[in-house]
Amino acid sequence: MQGNIIPKAIAVDINKGPLERANEHIRANGLTEQITTRLSNGLEAIHDGEVDSIVIAGMGGELVIHILTAGETVCRSAKELILQPQSEVSKVREYVRNTGYKIVDEDMILEDGKYYPMFRCVPCADNSAWDNMDETTVTVCDLYGPVLIKNGNPVLRKFLVRLPSCSS
């Protein structure tokens, strides 16, 4: 907001406490004209076509998928989804791939000993390229991220190096 990257935002949470804290931060930073908050289960309080981008972050992958599924019409009216599941990341990647989205950008950070992947998805009318890939390649892309792999993401490398290996 303060970098003028987006003109307006809507912060949504299902719980009052986090929303009240968000409102405190919004007021403290003088952003009440730019950011509104809504108490809502997922995307229920967002109207079709109301937003260009949807960010779903900081929750498990199953919940991310539930929110995307329940709010499918709102998601379809947005230009992009930015997702940061805390678990079951491969299931979220598989879900977006199988529901007509393409992951166009990804990043991964390491913070306090934890790895956090995030990815940007856009609607894709033709995801048939995946049909021509063998099952192992698709599984690896779902597990580790097609863009992270393609770009040789250094944090992904750290993540992979830490995996246990068999010693003889």
Stretch-by-stretch model annotation:
Residues 44-50, 62-168:
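Class I S-adenosyl-L-methionine
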Residues 58-59:
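Glycine-rich, N-terminal phosphate-binding loop of Rossmann-like dinucleotide-binding domains
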Residues 10-12, 38, 82, 119:
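Hydrophobic/aromatic beta-strand patches that form the interior of the parallel beta-sheet core
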Residues 8, 34, 80:
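Residues at the starts of beta-strands that form the adenosine-phosphate
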Residues 12, 16-52:
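S-adenosyl-L-methionine
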Residues 1-7:
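Conserved SAM-binding loop of SAM-dependent methyltransferases across substrates and taxa
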Residues 1, 22, 35, 64-68, ...:
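Hydrophobic packing residues within well-ordered alpha-helices of enzyme cores
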